[in-house]
C-alpha cells in the first residue's frame, strides 16, 4: 500500500473583517453577548469573491507550499455547501483557473466535515495507486446563505478556503482516518435547495438560508468531538500526551471547552482560531492546520489530530504525523 504525504498546505480568507460591533448595527446583539456564547470576535466576509475564487487562491498557496505544478495534479476534490453553480462543479472551475489539465474533478457536500472527507478520499485514491497527487479543498462563502436578521446563526459564520496537497511519498502523514454520518439528525442544521414545486418563485428562494437547532448541534458536537479523538487514538495506540495539538472544527469555544473537560485535557492542547474567523465550515480545520504549520508550532515527528463535525450530520477526523 502506498504511503501518503501532506506535501503542502494553503489557505485564504477575504480581507473584509466584520467584527461583533459591526454586527450589532444590523441585528439585535452585541460584542459581549457573542463572545460569551461563542468565543467569536470577528469573521471574514467576501466582497465579490465567490467560493471558486477563494478555493483557487488557497489552491495556489498549497501548490507553492508543495512546490508542484498544476499539471502534476491528478485529482481535485472540493468540499463545499456554497458552490458557485450547480453546474459546473467548483472543482472544475478551480481546474480551469489553475490550469490543472490532467486532473479529474468533483465536489462533495459534507458541510463542516467536508475537508476531512476530501482528505480521506484523496488518501484512498493514492493508497490504491489510482492517483499520485491530489488537491483537496474546503471552501465556503457562507455569508450568501445566512439570514442576517437571525442572530442565532448570522453571528457564527465566516467565509474562507483551505487546501492541501497529498502525494505518494516515502513517509506516511496520515496515520489513521475516521468518518461517519447521522442523517437521522439532519434536520438540526439545514439550508433548503431550490423548491421542487415552483422553482421560479422569488419568495421561496428567500427561504434558502441556514437554520439550526443550536442545542441539538451543541450536544452532538461535544459527543462527536470526544468520540472521534478517542477512536483515532485507540486505532494507533497513541495517548493524548503524545498529541501536540488537537485541531477541532472551529464552531464554538464552549463546544471545545466542554470536550476538553470530558477528555481531561488542558484547553491549550486545542488549537483555536475561531475568535478571528468564526465558523468557516469546510475550510475551518484546514485554515487552522495551515496556521499551525506556517507558525512553526509543530516539527517533524509531532502528531496532530484534526476533527470535523457539522451538517448532515457528518463527522470525521485524521491523525497526522508531521513529516
Swiss-Prot record:
Protein's cellular compartments: Cytoplasm
NADP is among the record's keywords: no
Keyword Lipid biosynthesis: yes
Superkingdom of the source species: Bacteria
Region called ACP-binding, residue ranges: 250-254
Main subcellular location: cytoplasm
Catalysed reaction equations from the record: malonyl-[ACP] + acetyl-CoA + H(+) = 3-oxobutanoyl-[ACP] + CO2 + CoA
Pfam family, one: ACP_syn_III
Active site per the UniProt annotation: 112, 249, 279
EC class of the enzyme, as a word: transferase
Pathway, per record: Lipid metabolism; fatty acid biosynthesis
The enzyme's E.C. designation: 2.3.1.180
GO molecular function: 3-oxoacyl-[acyl-carrier-protein] synthase activity; beta-ketoacyl-acyl-carrier-protein synthase III activity
GO cellular component: cytoplasm
GO terms under biological process: fatty acid biosynthetic process; secondary metabolite biosynthetic process
Entry keyword set: Acyltransferase, Cytoplasm, Fatty acid biosynthesis, Fatty acid metabolism, Lipid biosynthesis, Lipid metabolism, Multifunctional enzyme, Transferase
UniProt subunit comment: Homodimer.
UniProt function note: Catalyzes the condensation reaction of fatty acid synthesis by the addition to an acyl acceptor of two carbons from malonyl-ACP. Catalyzes the first condensation reaction which initiates fatty acid synthesis and may therefore play a role in governing the total rate of fatty acid production. Possesses both acetoacetyl-ACP synthase and acetyl transacylase activities. Its substrate specificity determines the biosynthesis of branched-chain and/or straight-chain of fatty acids.
Entry text on domains: The last Arg residue of the ACP-binding site is essential for the weak association between ACP/AcpP and FabH.
Annotated family: Belongs to the thiolase-like superfamily. FabH family.
Protein's recorded name: Beta-ketoacyl-[acyl-carrier-protein] synthase III
Gene this chain is encoded by: fabH
